[in-house]
Amino acid sequence: MKRSLFALALTVAALLTERPARAASCSFDTVTGLSFGNYDVFAASPTLSAGNLAYTCTGGATVTITLSIGSAPSFAPRWLLGPPGAHLQYNLFLDAGHATIWGDGTGVTGLYGPNAPADNATVMVPIFGSIPAGQDVPIGGYSDTITATINF
């Protein structure tokens, strides 16, 4: 009889003991970059594109995501670099209406989040891009490299 009670007491103690907290972790799963295609210097409307990034977190992380400036000296506008000395102004946005520039949350920029995703759930985040119309730039390839940082 004493053995049964002792075993029962250990079981109850084990059930009441706190589990150690699991460290939060997050990572990007995929990033689909933006491709603006051919830019028409005579077009009256901006050239638009969209991409997305996907991330997964565990351990109850609350997430924000920032984007770097890229090649430009500031967020507004960013630059796509082309032939020597040429750049094409563009920007990346948090919303399809292009109201909030996606940056690091300083100045004129916003950032994604905070968001508390479900544990181990993949979250897709859209990225919206726009090249303003009316830029007289030389023919050639233009590109920029942006770093996305997930903070948790």
How would you name each of these model-derived features?
Residues 18-20:
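N-terminal signal peptide c-region/cleavage motif recognized by signal peptidases
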Residues 7-15:
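Bacterial N-terminal signal peptides
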Residues 29-30, 101-110:
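Short beta-strand and strand-turn-strand segments in soluble, beta-rich domains
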Residues 22-84, 114-152:
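N-terminal small/polar-rich segments of proteins
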Residues 85-92, 99:
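Extracellular/luminal ectodomains and secreted, surface-exposed scaffolds of diverse proteins
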Residues 1-4:
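Positively charged n-region of N-terminal signal peptides that target proteins for export
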Residues 41, 95-97:
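Residues that form or immediately flank small-molecule/cofactor binding pockets and catalytic motifs
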Residues 68-70, 91-95:
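Predominantly extracellular/luminal cell-surface or secreted proteins
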